[in-house]
């Protein structure tokens, strides 16, 4: 039986790479993103929407999944707390944490009924240390790591596998916009054992 996968943040970066990998391996893949479906991914079943809004269209078009990849997220331009507005804080938490919680909660119900499922949350190196982002991003990713650990514990005996991936700097269009203009990319590469990002 072909497994069904949902990838959030499917149009670019890590999410796009996940989509390509699952498609290459024969999975039925659904992607959701606020940006357009990349034109070369015609076999991707795509839902264009803002995950911080009403999620009903997503849940209606895809009532259950076997594998959930919560990959959508945003950075915060490395702002310290005194430069972070309430609006910026809330926007980052709305996508990086709250949307993931709501999507996971919905599909978790179906996974519990089937007694099977895999949830992969895209945490970050900023989930475990400071300096991987600004105050809002780092706090949101710490919270996501906590949520991931708790649901992994809560559903371990229900045949639901929960994983939190915590990559360091990955070169994507989103990170390049933050890293390259001020030479941060060079510093990241120097601080990384493989000397690249």
Regions found by a protein language model. Name each.
Residues 79-81, 88-93, 184-188:
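Substrate-binding pocket helix/loop in short-chain dehydrogenase/reductase
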Residues 109, 153-154:
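Alpha-helical segment proximal to the catalytic Tyr-Lys
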Residues 11, 19:
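N-terminal Rossmann NAD(P)H-binding glycine-rich loop of SDR-like oxidoreductase domains
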Residues 104, 140, 148:
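Active-site helix of classical SDR
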Residues 124:
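Residue(s) in the substrate-gating loop at a strand-loop-helix junction
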Residues 167-177:
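Short, flexible catalytic-loop segment of classical short-chain dehydrogenase/reductase
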Residues 72-77:
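Conserved NAD(P)H cofactor-binding loop of Rossmann-fold oxidoreductase domains
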């Amino acid at each position: 039986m072909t497994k069904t996968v949902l990838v959030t943040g499917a149009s670019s970066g890590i999410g796009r790479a996940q989509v390509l990998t699952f498609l290459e391996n024969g999975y039925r893949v659904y992607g959701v993103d606020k940006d357009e479906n990349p034109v070369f991914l015609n076999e991707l079943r795509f839902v264009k929407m803002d995950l911080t809004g009403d999620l009903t269209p997503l849940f209606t078009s895809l009532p259950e999944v076997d594998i959930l990849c919560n990959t959508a997220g945003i950075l915060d331009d490395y702002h310290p707390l005194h430069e972070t507005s309430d609006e910026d804080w809330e926007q980052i938490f709305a996508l990086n944490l709250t949307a993931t919680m709501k999507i996971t909660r919905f599909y978790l119900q179906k996974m519990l009924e089937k007694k099977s499922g895999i949830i992969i949350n895209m945490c970050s190196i900023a989930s475990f240390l400071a300096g991987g982002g600004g105050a809002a991003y780092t706090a949101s990713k710490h919270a996501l790591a906590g949520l991931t650990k708790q649901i992994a514990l809560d559903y371990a005996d229900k045949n639901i596998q929960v994983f939190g991936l915590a990559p360091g700097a990955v070169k994507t269009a989103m990170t390049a916009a933050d890293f390259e203009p001020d030479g941060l990319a060079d510093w990241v590469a120097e601080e990384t054992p493989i000397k690249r990002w």
